[in-house]
A protein has these predicted regions:
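Conserved beta-strand in the GNAT
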Residues: 59-67, 74-79
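Conserved acetyl-CoA pyrophosphate-binding loop and the N-cap/start of the following alpha-helix
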Residues: 84, 88-96
């Protein structure tokens, strides 16, 4: 597996990857309809956002974006194709992101986690530092805000 920068022309593939990864958690189809526009990247998204992809057999199998959030590294869009979940792909990308952020002088990395991914991020050493209350189609959700010191 190779990790490389996302190419701007991969926005369609990565949109499909993100939707597939979200659908893996068994969310209701109505919720997926609501979320799909948020998981669909515009053609210029990766020209404006730094993204890194895990590549297997010359195709993206997972990716993340890294942003500056008021001096804190913010990990966004860590998605893994369902058939690669449990094969250390997410772990490798997470370690890549923390090393990249640390190398740039950030003291911590934060993210907002899907509740289904909470255990993964805890295994990566992250701690819950807060939460964001949300709702989808009238159903309340609590999204944990996680942090790891670099």
């Amino acid at each position: 597996m190779l990790i490389r920068e996302v190419r701007a022309d991969e926005y369609g593939l990565l949109s499909e990857l993100a939707v597939s990864a979200k659908r893996h958690w068994g969310y209701p189809e109505r919720w997926m309809e609501i979320w799909t526009p948020q998981l669909t990247f515009a053609y210029d998204y990766f020209e404006e956002h730094e993204g890194w992809a895990a590549i297997d057999d010359e195709k993206p199998i997972a990716f993340y974006t890294l942003e500056d959030n008021n001096g804190i590294a913010w990990l966004e869009n860590l998605w893994v194709l369902p058939e690669y979940i449990g094969r250390s792909v997410g772990k490798e990308l997470f370690h890549h992101a923390t090393a990249l952020a640390r190398g740039r002088g950030y003291k911590s990395l934060q993210l907002e986690a899907d509740p289904n991914a909470l255990g993964f991020y805890e295994r990566m050493g992250m701690k819950k530092i807060g939460e964001r209350h949300s709702d989808v189609d009238g159903t309340p959700r609590i999204l944990p805000i996680m942090e790891i010191a670099l």
